[in-house]
Amino acid sequence: VYVTGSNSKFLSSDIVTEFRGRGDEIRIYPLSFAEFYSVCEGDYDDAWDDYMIYGGLPQVVGLQSERQKADYLKNIFANVYLKDVIERNKIQNVDEIGILVDVLASAIGAPTNPSKIANTFASERQMSYTNKTISNHIDYLADAFLISKANRYDIKGRKYIGANLKYYFTDPGLRNARLNFRQQEPTNIMENIVYNELLIRGYNVDVGVVQIFDKDKEGKRVRKQLEVDFVVNQGNQRYYIQVAYDMTSEEKQTQEFNSLRNIPDSFKKVVIVNGSKKPWRNDEGFVI
């Protein structure tokens, strides 16, 4: 027996509670890029560009024009996803959560927290939006399977850092539709897609932090924090992953590699770069 329901009435968490010990949750994601490409026709690179803009909701694949795809995504976001969240949780101030979604969509992959978001509302929009309300609204969006949260993990300290989290959209097309397809940021969108792909493959995904000591311009010893895009775990397997849309400059290579160089263990280190070249290992053993 398979049990499903509208987000406005019946979330997966409700199913788990209702059928505790008598069933398992099966999470259905939008199409991965591999699934998307397997059913669409045409050039691989064109399909990738299309996926980055319009995402992998199954209905999108069958639509022909860009206008049809954009209209469909805008409509389903406003009249299904967001409406379900508002109705289920009896949200009175619709403007608040609407703007919150815009803020999260504009900053996918950027570390943030309710306090920072509240300050943004106060300074830029002159709106009072409490930390608790923001936190609750973010949870509602995650429960509705619209966004996902990634915790930050101190790799050397082997502990979670509770301050800032990263938020990603479960489908890049929905994210782009919410912003009216204005902010086409390939680096951040690609990072979002990689995050979703890792979840689809069953991995536990965190954001990594590496603490190092370096010297500032005056030669003083200072503590610095380097970021690893993803710390990926499954059983006894672990991977450290960096995502780079373009890594042609030496500065960008140094930025991506430096975090991996400072990880004091031998788990596999991977750099995912935009393009369809075969994987290879550099002199440091990083898979690119």
Give the location of each predicted region:
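Hydrophobic (often cysteine-bearing) scaffold residues that line and stabilize catalytic clefts
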Residues: 69, 73, 93, 130, ...
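Short, locally clustered residues in the helix-turn-helix/winged-helix DNA-binding domain
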Residues: 102-106, 122, 199
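A cross-kingdom feature that marks ATP-driven nucleic-acid transaction machinery
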Residues: 133-288
